[in-house]
Amino acid sequence: MAVSKVYARSVYDSRGNPTVEVELTTEKGVFRSIVPSGASTGIHEALEMRDGDKSKWLGKGVENAVKNVNDVIAPAFVKANVDIKDQKAVDDLLLSLDGTANKSKLGANAILGVSMAAARAAAAEKNVPLYQHLADLSDSKTSPFVLPVPFLNVLNGGSHAGGALALQEFMIAPTGAKSFREAMRIGSEVYHNLKSLTKKRYGSSAGNVGDEGGVAPDIQTAEEALDLIVDAIKAAGHEGKVKIGLDCASSEFFKDGKYDLDFKNPNSDASKWLSGPQLADLYHSLVKKYPIVSIEDPFAEDDWEAWSHFFKTAGVQIVADDLTVTNPKRIATAIEKKAADALLLKVNQIGSLSESIKAAQDSFAAGWGVMVSHRSGETEDTFIADLVVGLRTGQIKTGAPARSERLAKLNQLLRIEEELGDKAVYAGDNFHHGFKL
């Protein structure tokens, strides 16, 4: 079915920053996608094009990316008459129009918007849900479909919050639930208990939420944060059913080959900065003491030695985000160096759907897990909810059970679970190997 029109406009993300929305029109209707953006972005990511004109949107405008869709991609796309059901052909066309390794000519935000909108249009042309079309594209098994464990970011530190806490995300994972719906109820109850405990211990303003919906109290150490979460799990009556995941985002506090856990203090004491092995010892002690099942970005994005050293003895899922940035070359290196055993999949890091699917397939082939992820600057777009089901990864992180741009994805997963009924299973404790269920 022919695409009659491709059109982009600038809209706003959850931080109030401009982002790209793309509409693709076929006989079946108008199909829309909005591109997210990150705060802690890896240096090896595809280029998100921003205008840089400080007099408008403080330099964060996306008028050039929008113009690239409307003036370069749209005419070429309509003229090429590409079969939108063939995602590889769609993305190959987009990549050939750009011609750079990191999508810096047109912008990954321009390319991805079109790539996702095309997948939505193709699903409609086939008269199937988006998750089914994505399963077809990735040759995923669909009996049963797998609903993911939601890793809910309930407490924020690092670059996402004030306070001295260095680690960026503390997530709860309701692995003991029997269904996604029950996982959400458990997550919601723990979240509300955490909020009231936080206000009690740190004052009412501590209940205010960060970019991803988690509380951001003035906490100094990881232990203090974890004690608070464990207490909230107990108070909610869900002990044993809820595990914990960390996203350390440690590239953010890596300085001169060391890790500065007091990085938000401009006068931090350099004699207290930690070496890779010292930081690994800290993680080991946390894993011993708390029900942690997953640690993301424990070390900086090019500190390969620290990653490989820690992975040997970690005993929990080690997730690569800044290390791999959903980039097939970086993923291959991480697999070869035995640096991690799970990929954080962010579609806008690589900038097209086909490349995202390939990244997941490469990871599965190496026996890795895959956690599909939102970005901190999100929108009401729910694409990744269908993606996590289509790829059967068994795990997703898309913020707290609060703020509509986070809940949009979680609510879409509730709908998908309901629609699939007994054709789907909840990953639960098998989140790391969801694709094998």
Curated annotation (Swiss-Prot):
This is Enolase 2. GO terms for molecular function: magnesium ion binding; melatonin binding; phosphopyruvate hydratase activity. Its cofactor is Mg(2+). Mg(2+) is required for catalysis and for stabilizing the dimer. GO terms for biological process: glycolytic process; regulation of vacuole fusion, non-autophagic. Belongs to the enolase family. CDD domains: enolase. GO terms for cellular component: cell surface; cytosol; extracellular region; fungal-type vacuole; mitochondrion; phosphopyruvate hydratase complex. It is an enzyme of class 4 (lyase). Keywords: Cytoplasm, Glycolysis, Lyase, Magnesium, Metal-binding. PROSITE patterns: ENOLASE. Homodimer. Mg(2+) binds at D247, E296, D321. It catalyses: (2R)-2-phosphoglycerate = phosphoenolpyruvate + H2O. The keyword Cell wall biogenesis/degradation does not apply. It is found in: Cytoplasm. Pathway: Carbohydrate degradation; glycolysis; pyruvate from D-glyceraldehyde 3-phosphate: step 4/5. It comes from the Eukaryota. Its EC number is 4.2.1.11. The keyword Hydrolase does not apply. Substrate binds at H160, E169, E296, D321, S373, H374, R375, S376, K397. The active site is at E212 (proton donor), K346 (proton acceptor). The gene is ENO2.
